[in-house]
Amino acid sequence: MAKVSNYNNNNNNNNNNNNNNNNNNNYNQNSNNNINSNNNDKFNNRLKCLNCCRLGHTKANWWINNNNNNKDNSYNNNKINNIRDEEDVDLNGDDTFNDSNNDNSPSRGSINAIGENQEKLEKQNQMVISEKDCQENTSSKSIFSSNISIYRKGVKFIWNDKLCEYEINDKT
């Protein structure tokens, strides 16, 4: 009988150990998920500011997924805005752009939105970039050099709760 009792105790201990191992595995998995999530958040935040600073000094094509915009926003799908520091911002745009390859038919424009034009864009709740904001949130100031260009295409980032994509133009 002693052997049977020990057998049962061993089984119980093994079951408990297995349960503990499962709990540990779950804990480790959750911890890893949290770590990955935190790393992604840090990466996305860094990417967001880096791209915003780049865009502040670079003519860039940009697409805003209008599904993430306010429905009251006067900037509609299939409108194109040509934005320059020295020009007024055409907030109504021009019906000349229609991306037939994108089901969302996103809006497209060319941005160098620092200064007076930025203020106009902010009033329209558009994606705008402030060099000051980027400087406050970025340790590296070298990204403001106008001689630096990046050519990564289709990079997505969040800015003012909007999902955006950009493609850097050749700055010649």
UniProtKB/Swiss-Prot annotation:
**Protein's name according to its UniProt entry:** Putative uncharacterized protein DDB_G0271526
Compositional bias segments (type: Low complexity): 98-110
- Give the source's domain of life in one word: Eukaryota
Task: From the UniProt entry, list the residue stretches annotated as the region Disordered.
Answer: 1-39, 90-112
